[in-house]
Amino acid sequence: MKLTCMMIVAVLFLTAWTFATADDPRNRLENFFSKTQHEMKNPEASKLNKRCIAESEPCNIITQNCCDGKCLFFCIQIPE
């Protein structure tokens, strides 16, 4: 009986935590799961998959996608 009550309280707590930490207040769980499914279908959309460009490689001036330093058509390391 005590274990059942503890399980019910744990499930209610986790559900409330999920709603409280959701990004969009209107579509809390729906929005969370749709973003996750989109990232699974398109791994390039994942924030963890962002690639950076090594030094002396061509880069994008607008996005500044160099690992270290700055992008001036090629990634260059700027001494501090």
UniProtKB/Swiss-Prot annotation:
Tissue expression summary: Expressed by the venom duct.
Cellular localisation: Secreted
Disulfide bonds, paired cysteine numbers: C52-C67, C59-C71, C66-C75
Principal cellular location given in the protein's record: secreted
CC per GO annotation: extracellular region
InterPro entries referenced in this protein's UniProt entry, alphabetically: Conotoxin (IPR004214)
Signal peptide start and end residues: 1-22
Family: Belongs to the conotoxin O1 superfamily.
UniProt note: domains: The presence of a 'disulfide through disulfide knot' structurally defines this protein as a knottin. The cysteine framework is VI/VII (C-C-CC-C-C).
Name of this chain's protein: Conotoxin PnMKLT1-0121
